[in-house]
Design a protein with these regions (language model features):
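Long, internal low-complexity/basic segments
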Residues: 5, 53, 106, 111, ...
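Catalytic cores of eukaryotic secretory-pathway lumenal/extracellular enzymes that build
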Residues: 27-28
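Short beta-strand-to-turn element immediately C-terminal to the catalytic PLP-Schiff-base lysine
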Residues: 31-33
């Protein structure tokens, strides 16, 4: 609170705080120093997640992960080696809030399955959201500060992301491979009602 009073906000320009589904709770810089391999300075906006570390390390050592290990992990080693990849190549990433709510990100789109971004925490610097709603869709290329919910204008995108979220749950993974079981069952998960029609829950 004292830092905020002095004009310092830990989430910088981004909406939300740690624990929320907004960028202020998830977006962090990732810095790699590897002098023998990375000779020149490289800066990229390639989308990655902490879940990707296990696949990246396995890739580095030419190891193959078992089907039930790293089900949501994608290697970003090619990016470190200078290969030009984009967010679509990464596939979808599922975000999780401190209160158990979900969001999904694929490419430039991010869909939050909760009107309060999955948390009671509020950043006092944030301006009111334009077009609030039970679900929130943001174009992260043009609105990384998540100022405007564009779900109503992009119904097809919303449905596609709902289907993708359900697919990940149905298959127990967000990467290519043998389907895995979820533990516990999705029946008790929050937000499921938003995409329940696409789920295959016994």
């Amino acid at each position: 609170k004292t830092m905020q009073e002095q004009g310092h906000f830990s989430s910088y320009i981004y909406r939300g705080l740690k624990g929320t589904l907004y960028e202020g709770g998830h977006r962090v810089p990732f810095i790699v120093k590897w002098p023998k391999i990375i000779k020149d300075s490289i800066e990229t906006d390639y989308l990655t997640c902490t879940t990707d570390f296990i696949a990246t390390v396995a890739h580095l050592f030419d190891d193959i992960l078992p089907e039930n290990i790293g089900e949501d992990s994608v290697s970003f080693l090619p990016v470190l080696l200078g290969e030009d990849k984009n967010d679509i190549d990464r596939g979808g990433i599922v975000h999780h809030s401190d209160a158990g709510f979900f969001a999904i990100r694929k490419g430039k789109w991010k869909l939050i399955f909760d009107e309060n971004a999955g948390s009671r925490r509020v950043d006092p610097k944030d301006k009111p959201l334009i077009n609030p709603g039970e679900i929130q869709l943001f174009n992260m290329q043009t609105d990384a500060i998540e100022s405007t919910n564009v779900a109503a204008q992009n119904i097809d995108i919303v449905e596609d992301l709902k289907k993708l979220m359900a697919k990940f749950i149905n298959e127990g993974r967000s990467t290519v491979g043998k389907s895995q079981k979820n533990d516990p069952t999705p029946k008790g998960w929050k937000n499921v009602s938003h995409f329940e029609s696409y789920l295959k829950i016994n």
